Amino acid sequence: MSVVNDDFKPLLIQWVEEEAINATKRGSKMVDLYNKILFQLRGYELPICDLKTLKSIKYVGDKTANQLRKKIAKHCKENELTLPRGFMDVAEKHRLDLEESNLTSSTSTIKTTNKRAKTSSKSKPKYVPKHRSGGFAILIALYLYDKDRNGMTKERIIAGATPYCDRSFSNNAASKEFYSAWSSAKTLENHNLISTTGRSPKIYFLTDEGVSLAQQLKTAIGLSSPPEGSKKNDRNMIMEQSFDNGIRLDTSFELSSPAGRAMLSSSPIRRISNPVHSNRAIQKMLEKELRNGETPPSSQHDAGNRIYDGIKYEVWRKEDYEVIVYMDNREIRSRADRDHFQTRLQTLGVKCEVKPLSSGDVLWVGRNTSTGTEAVLNYLCERKRLDDLCDSIKDGRFQEQKNRMKKTGIKHCYYLVEDMVSYQDKVYDLMDSIQSSLTQTMTTARLYLRRFKDIDETTAFIASNTKVIENLKSNLIVIKPQDIKNQQDYLNILLKFRNKFEKTQPHQDNPDYECVQLFSRFQDMLGKTNQMTVKEMFILMLMTIRGVSLEKAVVIQNRFPTPKSLLEYYHTEHATTDTNIKRDLMMNEFKDQIGNKKIGKALSEKIYNVWGKP
């Protein structure tokens, strides 16, 4: 066979053009993706000689790259050309390595000793798995837990290896994650680092080479014993070893007090970028809402009985409570793996429980170690996978969830977005909307936005954030109101206590207090339907009409304060109006609105069909 030209770019451009034409004929949405790839390929100046270079081009994902690789392989076969190693799949590379190995072994028998020495000096470098990868964790687990070299089952290895790996050992077909950390076991076997025996169950052993490499890895990371040795050391070790994937603590970490800085400087944990600091902008905005609302009556403080403005409260010292992470029970990895978050966080040394939450997907609470009473701490997360984010943008849940997070009065609200292994068509269609929505989350909504590669990075962030929260614990003033009228009253009470107790006087040596609500009050008051005002309920009713976003619903509610006023507008004021004119009433009523607040003809007719049709 002859050798193929190094640069495949001209062929790739030709093939992508053909795919774009075929997609156009079929009416497929993939035509937009192919056109974007085509534009990037034409502007790429360097030659494309391997699969890694091809994947580095913008918009070329794993699936597209694999399709193009197959076309290259077919082209080489039809034209009797040698397929470059960079475009071979794993099986082809393995077969080529075996052929080269056999050729080398047969040749070495007839070469001199000097020739053999020269050949061995040019041999391939020894395989060493990356730190905290699946292969690394499997070797460490077998070395630590299989002292007698009797072998271990897959389940036992995973249980021991999980603390030493940043990725999950189970795949998730729902998010197109078909490979897990356990896939590295095959690589270790191919490199003669582990061996297997039996079928059901299959038993895994370390080879002599595997024992030697595992011992070197153990020494390199300074690991002295298995995690079972000490629970406290276990948690510190696990957390210390998990801060290495770009979402961890760095020197830009902002602290509110010298005591906090001293506390973290002595901790084995490195510093996380932009996590827990006082969100002054949200606090000012909430205080402004309180000033614009009803003016509270003159407040009386009975410090002896711990009553402020007729509302009882408790004081918890830092030592009186522990930090617990609550995960919403709807947050799952897949239908077959519903307990992924809880299991993974507990492995990382985090106390985690699963229960339905009224707002958000991840909530940090303080539990009194004596009474068991629970209070909501000032940290809340909303988690979205990219495809779910697209759906929530289209149906209006995106804006609603952000508003509900702000109603909690929690100072540190995070919006966590997870990327997907392969994007669906709807993600490409809404790429511009996603970008603008995420930008608004940081600017207009003033929430912390964090974007992660996969579910494992999200879990690692939650674990590391929990550690920081534990180190920055404050004395708590736990509010215990007897009667809360609605969600706005819940927020007003919280802000009232903050204005009283969280503003330290300049000449007083007051401890650092945080005012928080009981978790039971949080659950009762912040549900989607619990204790809603007529205004909030009416807005939700309007948003059930397809096409009515939160912005449009608010505009309609400002013009028609109650459902009754909208019904009277159609059935009383315009009772004798022609039906065709009635269909356009909403469009004409809001014709002066701008942007996404304007109501079009089709939407006006939908609103008429629901509210104005006899």
UniProtKB/Swiss-Prot annotation:
Biased composition annotated in UniProt, kind: Basic residues: 113-128
InterPro entries: DNA_pol_lamdba_lyase_dom_sf (IPR027421), EME1/EME2_C (IPR042530), ERCC4_domain (IPR006166), Mus81 (IPR033309), Restrct_endonuc-II-like (IPR011335), WH-like_DNA-bd_sf (IPR036388), WH_MUS81 (IPR047417), XPF_nuclease_Mus81 (IPR047416)
One cellular component term from this protein's GO annotations in UniProt: nucleus
Cofactor(s) demanded: Mg(2+)
Pfam family, one: ERCC4
Gene Ontology molecular function: any one: DNA binding
Subunit text: Interacts with EME1.
Function, as annotated: Interacts with EME1 to form a DNA structure-specific endonuclease with substrate preference for branched DNA structures with a 5'-end at the branch nick. Typical substrates include 3'-flap structures, D-loops, replication forks and nicked Holliday junctions. May be required in mitosis for the processing of stalled or collapsed replication fork intermediates. May be required in meiosis for the repair of meiosis-specific double strand breaks subsequent to single-end invasion (SEI).
Protein's UniProt name: Crossover junction endonuclease MUS81
Biological classification of the source: Eukaryota, Fungi, Dikarya, Ascomycota, Saccharomycotina
